[in-house]
Amino acid sequence: MVLSPDDKKHVKAAWGKVGEHAGEYGAEALERMFLSFPTTKTYFPHFDLSHGSDQVNKHGKKVADALTLAVGHVDDMPQALSKLSDLHAHKLRVDPVNFKLLSHCLLVTLAAHLPAEFTPAVHASLDKFLASVSTVLTSKYR
């Protein structure tokens, strides 16, 4: 999915507002995903999935760090996320549908925390961005 110049501007501005809360929002999105889509828990059998667990918080930070990397390399996400794509395709073997589920939960989390910034245009741009990240992360499944 191609991001327009306006999409890129919206994504960078929105992620800039996330700032130091990125890890917190990443963990919250994971918790939302586990609660809303319980089958996603199967990829984390060794995690304490309770609210506020250190493992979920640490993984939420990893998710947020990957998104920060993608935002910073929005014009070259395949290169920037190549190692992460390899990890998810070859080692973790995460079902690609789970990226869509997490993307949805990230959008809900961002809308809850940034209601003034979460305009329809920003929502659409973030949705396209997360779809692009998902496409990159699943590109090596083929």
From Swiss-Prot:
Residues bearing the modification Phosphotyrosine: 25
Domain called Globin: residue spans: 2-142
Positions bound to heme b: 88
N6-succinyllysine sites (modified residues): 8, 12, 17, 41
Residue(s) carrying N6-acetyllysine: 17
Residue positions, PTM Phosphothreonine: 109, 135, 138
Superkingdom, taxonomy of origin: Eukaryota
Record-listed O2 binding positions: 59
Tissues showing expression: Red blood cells.
Quaternary structure (record): Heterotetramer of two alpha chains and two beta chains.
Function description: Involved in oxygen transport from the lung to the various peripheral tissues.
Family note: Belongs to the globin family.
Protein name: Hemoglobin subunit alpha
Gene: HBA
